Amino acid sequence: MTRLGYQIPNFDYPGVAPSGIFDTVVAQAKAAEASGFDRVFVMDHFYQLPGIGNPDDTMFECYTLLAALAQHTERVRLSALVTGNTYRNPAVLAKTITALDHVSHGRATLGIGSGWFELEHDSFGIPFNTFSERFEKLEEALNIILPMLRGERPSLDGKHYTVSDAINEPQPLSKIPVMIGGSGEKKTLRMVAQYADESNLTCSTEEIPRKLEALDAHCERLGRDRSEIKVTKLVMMAIGETHDQCVADLKAFAEFKGWPESVVDMMLGMLTYGGPDEVAEQVREMIDAGIDGVTVNLVSNGHNPEMVELAGRTLDAAIG
C-alpha cells in the first residue's frame, strides 16, 4: 500500500520543448523511485485542471503514459490518481489495468473515482450525468472490474452498464490493489469500505479524524476489517532547500504561466510549502491525525529532479 506517493500533475515546463516533455516526465518518475517514493501517479484527465493551468495546456492520456513509464522504472507501483470512471467502459478498463500490470511486471494499482470535471465531459461528448448517477455508475463498474481482475466472467444487466460473461485473459500477474479517491463520507467512503484496499483523501488536515470516523463506521456496518484498508491523503506541495527558494520557485512558475502575483498568494493559502523542516512538520501533523501515508505533487518545481529527491528524503524521514 502507498506510504509515500508522487503524482505528476502537469506537463508544461519552463525551457522544455514539446519534444522534451516525455523525457522530463521520465526524469521525475526515476527521481521519485530513487528517493523513497513507492508509487508514481499521473492524473486521468484530458484537460489541465483549474488552479494548475489552462484547459489547453499539455495533457497526456493516463494509461498510455503509465505503460511508457513502466519501461523506465523498476520498483515503484504505477497508478492513475484517479481514473475517471465515466471515461471508459468498465470491462475495457479491466483489460487496460491488466495490460499495465503485465508491462510493468506486476506493479499496477487501480486508482478510481466517480469523475467530476464537467468541461472534459462536455467537450468530448461523454455523458456527465448527475452526481448520484456518477456514483451509481462507479459502483456498477466496480462490480464488473473487480470480478474480471479475479478471474471471473461477470454478467451484469445494470442501469448504466451491460456485460455478458466478460473475459479477461491473461489475468493480472498478482492481486491488483484498488484505491478509491475522494472524501465523501456517505458515498465514497462507503465504497472504500465495501470494495477498496486503499482510500486517498482530498481534505484538510483538520478534517482527517472525521473522515476516518466515517470510514470506521462504514466498515463496522459492512463487517469489513478496518485494518485491511490503508488511508492516504493527496497533498499539493511546494518545497525548496529554503523557505525563500520555495516561494521563488512558485513565483517563477506563476510567471511562466502568465499569472498575476495575486495567484501566488492564493496558492500559498492552499499548499503545504516551505523548506524541508517546515514541510516535514506539516506532514507529521497529517500522519498524527491518523492517516498511513501521503501522495504529493510538486506543481511548481517537480520538473527539477533535485526537488523530487529533496521531497522524497524529507517526507521519508517525516513519516518514519
Predicted regions: what is each one?
Residues 8-23, 81-91, 173-184, 237, ...:
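Active-site mouth loops of central-metabolism enzymes
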Residues 4-8, 40-42, 77-80, 108-112, ...:
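Hydrophobic faces of well-ordered beta-strands that scaffold small-molecule active sites
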Residues 1-72, 174-176, 251:
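N-terminal beta1-alpha1-beta2 module of alpha/beta enzyme domains
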Residues 2, 52-53, 80, 86-195, ...:
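Internal, glycine-rich beta/alpha segment that forms the wall or movable "lid"
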Residues 8, 33, 132-167, 172, ...:
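An alpha-helical appendage that flanks or caps ligand/catalytic pockets
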